[in-house]
Amino acid sequence: NYRSCENSCLSVTVNSNVYHEEDKMSTVAVQRSKTYDIVYIAVFAVIMAICSWISIPMTVPFTLQTFGVFMAVGVLGGKRGSLAVLVYILLGVIGVPVFAGFSGGLGILLNNTGGYIIGFLFSALVMWAMESLWGKKPVIQILSMVVGLIVCYAMGTIWFMVVYTRTTGAVGIGTVLGWCVIPFIIPDLVKIALAFVLSRRVRKLVPMQ
């Protein structure tokens, strides 16, 4: 009986130590995952800033911002990608010059083209929603990018019309589409194609939990 009790106690001790080590390993894994998340989100916020600095002045500046948004969600997934876009926008709001033309500040969001910047976040959220509903299949990823782009166009165009009407005068939707959307459709579709191909390759190199 003594030997049996001794063996039982030893077994309990060993099991307890094993569980303790597993808990420690689990905690370390969670902490490491959170660290990775923070780093990846920060990196893609910087990438979006760099994409915005590559700019051609137009009524709505031509930039690679949408490419940056699509890459962020494509590589990091909907949740992390959306957070990266949010961080990027918040950096701009507090004055960090991450927007087109090395600009920053809340005033950028409040001017004619600010709706397109806000639209980036809603594009990412739409992509996240579609990913959550239908997974990460290639056709879903491409479709989510296209739908996200349409959402960005819609928000930006409505915002532009409202602000322009208040500050300058009435303007028709056809005119605004001609200024702010139509010239960008083909370039944006090219960005979607590039982001789709590159994000699927980069995602294989990025360790994700």
Regions found by a protein language model. Give the residues of each.
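Membrane-interface elements of multi-pass transporters and channels
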Residues: R32, I54-M58, K79, I94-V98, ...
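Alpha-helical membrane-inserting segments
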Residues: I47, C51, S55, A72, ...
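Hydrophobic transmembrane alpha-helices
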Residues: M25-S82, I94
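Short helix-perturbing small/polar motifs within transmembrane alpha-helices
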Residues: M25-V28, V43, I50, L106-A154
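Interfacial aromatic-anchored transmembrane helix boundaries in multi-pass membrane proteins
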Residues: S52-L64, I89-S123
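Membrane-embedded alpha-helical hairpins and interfacial helices in multi-pass inner-membrane proteins
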Residues: K136-Q209
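Alpha-helical transmembrane segments and their helix-entry boundary regions
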Residues: G81-V85, I108, Q141, V176
